[in-house]
Amino acid sequence: MSEPLARRVPIRVLTFVAVLGVLWGIWELWHWIGTRFKLTWPFTVNDVTMPHLHRIVQALFQPAQANGPSLLHVLLNASLFTAKEAALGFALGAVGGFAIAVVLSQSRFLERGIIPYVVASQTIPLLAIAPMVVVGLGSKGIHDWLAVSVLAAYLTFFPVTINALRGLQSADPRAVELMRSYAASRWSILWKLQAPTSLPYLFSAFRIAAPLAIVGAIISEPSASIQGGLGGAIVNFNQYYSIEPQDLWATNVISALLGIGFFLIVVLAERLLVRRAPENVA
């Protein structure tokens, strides 16, 4: 580990812990104020709507059901299942989004004609198309969890397409003309110039798409009647929210941590693969 990195890591860890501590304090302060003064705006504050954070942490180490494994054990297994679906969905969305961007980058006519439909695809609620995808793929004998991956890909391909297209079009026009003057083919220009130039833009999209893959998988699991993932756990604990709200909150925390984990993997991959990023990358 280099010396600058060795200095940055402890600072970032301390910053994360400090921010977490501040948020914890704000939560508990608002809980105390809300219960003490019986606040009803923006919502009624009580132990159901805002359970103490220490109760949420304690719930992770208590049995999820009588004589069963701990809630943390159950949620970790559910996280692995959802992570499998989301990882495949992310890969499908990334490959599909980049492929669409490559096609559109070769023709302004195609770009102007297809981009509006790409944008319009994101206005359709995932819950509306999830049953159609699950039933349609199920009729072909495809496993339900693969249908969930397809739905996760549906959420992830859009940012990849838009950013990849921007990256492919950001190649220096002078470099493109120089390669053409040496009779370079479109394929050579694409893979030797445009694709490397688009990497920073791609990873900007991947940082957005990775957590979206988790969201897509979790939302789609109930439509596929999958009980083994985080989506199934959320639906299950939602039925007992008025009695044990901390279980649902704990599930939400684990879901958020899984999304953060996917994001950090992308950040690590970016640091390993992208050496220099253009300053104007969003």
Which functions belong to the PLM regions below?
Residues G34-A91:
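Periplasmic/extracellular loop-to-transmembrane helix junction in inner-membrane transport proteins
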